[in-house]
Amino acid sequence: MRPLIACALALSLFGSQNLSARPALRDYILTGAKPDHLFVIDAAARKVTSDIRVPDANGIVGLVVPSPDGKRAYVLVNRMESISGIDLDTGKQVFRANLSSGDEVVHSFFSVNITPDGRELIVHELPTKRGLNEYHVQEPRFAIFKTDAGLDAKPVRVFPAPRRVHLVLPKADGKSFYALGFQLFEYDLATGKKLGERGIRNWGRPGYSTPDMLAFWPVTEPLDVFVTPVYSTLGTGKDAIAKTSLMKLDLKSGALSYQDFEDTSAVIFSAVASPRNGEVFTVYTQLSKIDTNKGVLVDRVNLPHTFYTINIASDGHEVFVGGTMCDVAFYDPDTLKQRANLKLPGCPDQSISTLRVIRR
Amino acid sequence: MSLSSIDRLRRWRRAMLGCVMLLGAAGWLAAPAMADAPPAADQQTVRTWCAGCHTEDTPGQFQRLSAVRKSPEGWQMTIFRMQHVHNLALPDDARDAIVKFLSDTQGLAPSESAAGRFALERRPNMPDLKLGDDLPDMCGRCHSLARVSLQRRDADTWLRLVHMHVGQFPSLEYQASARDRYWWDIATKQLPAKLGAMFPFDTQAWRGWMNRPHADLGGEWLVHGHSPGKGDFVGTLSVKATGGDNYTAHYSLQSPEGKPIGEIDSLVRVYTGYEWRGSSKVGSVDTHEVLALSEDGRRLTGRWFEAAHTEVGGDVVAERAEGPAAVFMVSPRALKIGTTSEVLIAGRGLNGTVTFGNGTSVKVLKASPTLIRASVKVNDKAAPGPRAVTVGRTSAADMAAVYDKVDRLDVQPAYGIARVGGGHIDPVTAQFEAFGFIESQAGQAPVALGPMNVSWKVEPYNADAVKAQDVKFAGRIQPDGSFVPGPGGPNPERVFGTNNAGDLTVVAGLDQEGKELRGQAHLIVTVQRWNTPPIY
């Protein structure tokens, strides 16, 4: 029964806009859930328009990467060993890259992204050779896949990569991409040549400790800006103060900046930059609003439960929180009051999945 | 926000990310009972089941497999991985036989397993081994360093183990206390040599031990012990060999007051000539004993515990029944000045006048060569301090202690962890005990009075615990000092609907002439562990 409904929903998705003469673009939210769900939510209607079952997901739909035209979503499944590309109109799998092959098991730690032209996927791979009686961990690498490669995609280019990369972010000009790990690395997309490396471990902020960051939700919409919390201590010994800062990477200009806004007083998992007034919203068990023009925490409210991920309407008029459990909640960016809460059908666990916004 | 609350936030965040990252980790089955079928194994059994992957390079030398030595539980865990990760279809009897054979031929000498025994004995809330600055974070944050210390291998084989870790758990390098350093570089370039020097494959100790004939444990033994929260016990143990290092054992136990505790039958297999693993039932509860035979073959020491609640158990000592006269235990140990108390003396070959030293008078109520019940009166003039107890010509120092006032209560464990239950996982309780001490003059050690009868309560550990009402939600402490955590899962009554975690101070109170002496410990109530491997 369930797959039939899913298909029906999938077919009707986006149907309405074709009927109108001048289709107004709408925001759709994408999120994954255990064991194989990819949900499409009409944000304004507060409605799940599609519950797509990803083939051979094997446990969890973690990372979600929409294509720039919003027609497809690439999801990391099969315990980080496979990438499945789903056509959001039909709900069908149109792309599949099983990263492991032969005696080599390959994982990607959430480090998958798509180029701005939608033609290539950039994947940071962690390969291990499995011998008869031993494992041999190999050096990591970047693998580039063509998005039109179909259901047995193989990389078209492979380059050496640093260890412990947790996020890949393409630069807006499509010529290079960033990899976030020990440092912020930049690589030429065509040749794999390392173009630069900026400090994260040694971020060059006098008096501050080495920062701690673990960001694996590559949310950069709607501004082509990536923001994430960074934790450190300022000073040493008895006078040490725990600091939460925002790291901001502008994918258009390549500018990297850090901004303090509070002595650590809350756990924050993820953040999103609003198109309005330099505001940034962050989430975990609280929803916070930060004014990055002034570098201050403007407001903070308790949430009914923990949410790992956050995103925002394209025009900034609404904040979305999701991940962790089986609901997505909608918040007023001015008052931080909840406007709506949408329970996903069947209440499947979103866990660490990514909340993404597409415009269709 | 206070630093401690920031620590608390960090801990949560770290715990959260920990769970998030370990999604790919293989679960553990409960440890199988290891003593029900007498196995016989030789190299051929290993060849049959293991050589398909572990190529036999020279006769009896199997790749990888022949380059490590471990405890029986270490072998059990490795073979579990062969079955569940590498899809080895291995019948239980062959598995048990191979664990036995490899523990005997590639095991650990008693001196090599000594430091990490507490992990084999499943002792709860033990401080981990101190093995230098980098190992606690590098290797001791997911499991104990005791697990590491219970293996012997050379540098190249330690390196292969690092490859297994990262290959099997690719999120390892991304977790807290790994991502803050060049984990892979340290683990592959620095640690193998260090571990190889600390815990090498080839040792004098093992060469000496492996060729010694195994002692026959058959015969009669005298048992004494102590179970925290329950008290002391004494009794006898009869052991019969059934072949192939397997035994049947019968314990007959009683409390110091003479109340029967149980007639307990245990199936025992002895590994490596000294590792006693028993499986028994006390009433309807499945229990195990993990004991070690002393090198002279005359004494077994270790711990019994409940199979399903390994945190519940106690210390066990068994001495050969044959042997020179000796006093093993006096219960209770502490005797208050100006009072008369009944005590039990447990020993071997006990015969003659009983004395507890100056200022005491002893009346024997009942006597046998192994148990003497006596009434001991301590005069008002008696001097506080440790006492030797003498029976006839046998004397044992520091078996009892005379006191007027308890100066200090030391609550153990000083730092305890209890876990809420959830799903099919039972809560993990935490047992506390309060040990009394008399502070002595400068330069002298305090006098230990042993476990005291105290009242128990819990208080919030800090301001955050007050605010979160941890005392209300996290659980209850029982009159015997056992903390039973609250139910698992999110609690809608709590802020953020958080689970019943808590940060508590455990307080022991002893009333002394209207004045309360306090002792305290720190208790963290946290979420369940999803798997409990045989060696934590």
Which sequence ranges carry the predicted segments?
Chain B
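Gly/Gly-Pro-rich "capping" loops immediately C-terminal to redox-active cysteine motifs
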Residues: 57-85, 132, 144-169, 263
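C-terminal capping alpha-helices of c-type cytochrome domains
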Residues: 87-117, 170-210
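Edge beta-strand at a domain terminus
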Residues: 204, 211, 216, 288, ...
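Immunoglobulin-like IPT/TIG beta-sandwich domains and homologous Ig-like subdomains
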Residues: 336-393, 450-453, 459-467, 471-474, ...
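Electrostatic cytochrome c docking/interface patches
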Residues: 31-46, 86-87, 94, 109-133, ...
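Central antiparallel beta-sheet cores of small beta-barrel/beta-sandwich binding domains
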Residues: 143, 208-211, 215-296, 301-304, ...
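Beta-strand/beta-sandwich contexts
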Residues: 320-353, 394-446
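The canonical Cys-X-X-Cys-His
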Residues: 47-58, 98, 135-147
